C-alpha cells in the first residue's frame, strides 16, 4: 500500500485522510499544516459539521496524530521545501492547500523526498486526470499530476458517456455549487472578483468556473465544445451540474437514461451513479460517487437538444477520487 503525506489539513486534506482510512486503499503517514497544531488537528479531524463525527479513535500521542491506532507524523512548515516527507516515509504527497497548484510550486515537495505529488485542485500546467475518464493515460514518468476539480469530476464522466454514445456537438454547463472556504460569511473585499466577496449565506452568487473547459483537457475530442459558469448558493455541501447540450445523433431521453444506467453499473461503477428517486441535495451528503445522474430531473426539448442533471458531494466524492487516483498510480510503479 502506498504511503501518503497530506499538505494542508483543510476540508479536502481532512476528507482525503478520512477517505483513505475508511477505504484502506492508501496509508496516510504524514500531515503538514503550519496553521493547525496537533491538538487542534485531533479536534478538527474528529468533529465535522457536514459529514458527522469520525467513526473511529483519534488522539495525540508522543507528538503524533494517532488515528485508529496508527501514528501519523506531523509537520508545521510554511515552506514546502522544508517538509521532510522522505523521513516520514511518504512516497506520494497530496497538495491540498490550494496554494501550490503549479508544477513549479508543487514540485517543492519532491525536494523533501516525495516521489510524486497529486494536486487536489485544477492546475494551470500539471497534467489533469479524472478517474473513469482519462486515468489510463497516466504513465509513471509523471511526477506531478492534478486530480482536476470536483465539478470537472462530476461533469466529465457524464459528458464521456453522452459523447461516446451520441456525440456532443456543443454544450453549456451550469453548476449550482455549495459554499466553500474561499467565500465570505458577510460582505467583504475579494480582490478582482467583486461578487465572490458578497455574503455566502445571503446570496445566490454568479461565479466563473474552469470546470467545463477543463473537460476538453481530459476528453480531447470535446476541446472547445464546452464552457460554463457557476452559481454559488447558501448550502454547506453538495452541488449539482446542469449540462445542456446538442447531440450529433438524435436520441430519445429514455435512450440517454439507458446508456447512463448501463455505464453506472459497468465501466463507471462507483464513479458515476444513477437514480430515478425524487432526490434533493441533502440526499448526496457523504456520497462517494464523482457524479450521480438524476434521471427524473433532466428534460429534452427534442431528440437533439437536452438538459442533463447530475449531483455530486463536492467534498467527499472528490476526496475519494484523490485516493483512487493515488491507488491507481501506485499500481503502475
From Swiss-Prot:
Modified residues annotated as ADP-ribosylcysteine in this record: 150
Short motif [IL]-x-C-x-x-[DE] motif, span: 243-248
Residues annotated with S-nitrosocysteine modification: 150, 245
Catalytic residues identified in the record: 150 (nucleophile)
Positions bearing Phosphothreonine: 73, 151, 175, 180, 182, 209, 227, 235
Modification sites for N6-acetyllysine: 59, 192, 217, 225, 252
PROSITE patterns the record matches: GAPDH (PS00071)
Coiled-coil stretches noted in the UniProt entry, renumbered to this chain: none
Domain of life of the source: Eukaryota
UniProt modification remark: ISGylated. S-nitrosylation of Cys-150 leads to interaction with SIAH1, followed by translocation to the nucleus S-nitrosylation of Cys-245 is induced by interferon-gamma and LDL(ox) implicating the iNOS-S100A8/9 transnitrosylase complex and seems to prevent interaction with phosphorylated RPL13A and to interfere with GAIT complex activity.
Residues modified to Deamidated asparagine: 7, 62, 68, 147, 153, 223, 314
Location in or out of the cell: Cytoplasm, Cytosol; Cytoplasm, Cytoskeleton; Nucleus
PTM-bearing positions, type Cysteine persulfide: 150
Phosphotyrosine: modified positions: 40
Involved pathway(s): Carbohydrate degradation; glycolysis; pyruvate from D-glyceraldehyde 3-phosphate: step 1/5
Domain notes: The [IL]-x-C-x-x-[DE] motif is a proposed target motif for cysteine S-nitrosylation mediated by the iNOS-S100A8/A9 transnitrosylase complex.
Family that this chain belongs to: Belongs to the glyceraldehyde-3-phosphate dehydrogenase family.
Protein name (record): Glyceraldehyde-3-phosphate dehydrogenase
Amino acid at each position: 500500500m502506498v504511503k501518503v503525506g497530506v499538505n494542508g489539513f483543510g476540508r479536502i486534506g481532512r476528507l482525503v485522510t478520512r477517505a483513505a482510512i475508511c477505504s484502506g486503499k492508501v496509508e496516510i503517514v504524514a500531515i503538514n499544516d503550519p496553521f493547525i497544531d496537533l491538538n487542534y488537528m485531533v479536534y478538527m479531524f474528529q468533529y465535522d459539521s457536514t459529514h458527522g463525527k469520525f467513526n473511529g479513535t483519534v488522539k495525540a500521542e508522543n507528538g503524533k496524530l494517532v488515528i485508529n491506532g496508527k501514528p501519523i507524523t506531523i509537520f508545521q512548515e510554511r515552506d514546502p521545501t522544508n517538509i521532510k516527507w522522505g523521513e516520514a516515509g511518504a512516497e506520494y504527497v497530496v497538495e491540498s492547500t490550494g496554494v501550490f497548484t503549479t508544477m513549479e510550486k508543487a514540485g517543492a515537495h519532491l525536494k523533501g523526498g516525495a516521489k510524486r505529488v497529486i494536486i487536489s485542485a485544477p492546475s494551470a500546467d500539471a497534467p489533469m486526470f479524472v478517474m473513469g475518464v482519462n486515468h489510463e493515460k497516466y504513465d509513471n514518468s509523471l511526477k506531478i499530476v492534478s486530480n482536476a476539480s470536483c465539478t470537472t469530476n462530476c461533469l466529465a464522466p457524464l459528458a464521456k458517456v453522452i459523447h461516446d454514445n451520441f456525440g456532443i456537438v456543443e454544450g453549456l454547463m451550469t453548476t449550482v455549487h455549495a459554499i466553500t472556504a474561499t467565500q465570505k460569511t458577510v460582505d467583504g473585499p475579494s480582490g478582482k472578483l467583486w461578487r465572490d466577496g458578497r455574503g455566502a449565506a445571503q446570496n445566490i452568487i454568479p461565479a466563473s468556473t474552469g470546470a467545463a473547459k477543463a473537460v476538453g483537457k481530459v476528453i480531447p475530442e470535446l476541446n472547445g465544445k464546452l464552457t460554463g459558469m457557476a452559481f454559488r448558493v447558501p448550502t454547506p455541501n453538495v452541488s449539482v451540474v446542469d449540462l445542456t447540450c446538442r447531440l450529433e445523433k438524435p436520441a430519445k431521453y429514455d435512450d440517454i437514461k439507458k446508456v447512463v444506467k448501463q455505464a453506472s453499473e459497468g465501466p463507471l461503477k462507483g464513479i458515476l451513479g444513477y437514480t430515478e428517486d425524487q432526490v434533493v441535495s441533502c440526499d448526496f451528503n457523504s456520497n462517494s460517487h464523482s457524479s450521480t445522474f438524476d434521471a427524473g430531473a433532466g428534460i429534452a426539448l427534442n431528440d437533439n437538444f437536452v438538459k442533463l442533471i447530475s449531483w455530486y458531494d463536492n467534498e467527499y466524492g472528490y476526496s475519494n477520487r484523490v485516493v483512487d487516483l493515488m491507488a491507481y498510480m501506485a499500481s503502475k510503479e
